From Swiss-Prot:
Taxonomic placement: Bacteria, Bacillati, Actinomycetota, Actinomycetes, Mycobacteriales
Subcellular location: Cytoplasm
Residues given in the record as UMP binding sites: 59, 79, 140-147
Protein's UniProt name: Uridylate kinase
Binding residue positions for ATP: 18-21, 60, 64, 173, 176
Coiled coil: none
Organism per entry: Corynebacterium glutamicum (strain ATCC 13032 / DSM 20300 / JCM 1318 / BCRC 11384 / CCUG 27702 / LMG 3730 / NBRC 12168 / NCIMB 10025 / NRRL B-2784 / 534)
Amino acid sequence: MTTSSEQPRTGYKRVMLKLGGEMFGGGKVGVDPDVVDNVARQIAEVAKTGAEIAVVIGGGNFFRGAELQQRGMDRARSDYMGMLGTVMNCLALQDFLGQHGVECRVQTAINMAQVAEPYLPLRAERHLEKGRVVIFGAGMGMPYFSTDTTAAQRALEIGCDVLLMAKAVDGVYSDDPRTNPDAELFTEITPKEVIEKGLKVADATAFSLCMDNKMPILVFNLLTEGNIARAISGERIGTLVES
């Protein structure tokens, strides 16, 4: 475990950026245009430098399948509602990226040809090579799989160098920093140490996919201006989870 080290990090060429849907809503139901515009601007600035950026967005600002299930809804049906929510977020981000001069394609795991391409990994890779941002919507297209898991699976299939987990905190802590002021921020940690310490990085399925396939995970604070660029360039921000 490393909590403070000056060992340099390398930058990344192709990245998967996982964004929580709650952030798009600014704490409310729906899409906050100012928030989405800010995220789009940061992504556009980095994309114009030659970085290849794929994005997965949650749908928590519209629906959360697990929460709807607790209120008596069928889990599969409520998960599909959540998937549709992610597509609305994808289209919003696509529009704002276009306003910032970046070409973008949305690919969805559920066929909806009038608004997006179907998920085709080889086509997604070609888009990235041509400098387009690719946003993956509708989760895995199947219930019981989170958007964290989608981000991990897509990152592996299209050959990303790292999974960037954008959060509202600075990284992975030894305890909840909101309730424990003495909580320690890890700058580097191994997957084994994450498990031993019971730390929360991503959901269990997503974390296992990354650990088994040696995909690094970088957890960082999206609310700090310029952090997407810093994360991709290799600056020492957030927490790097790597074997």
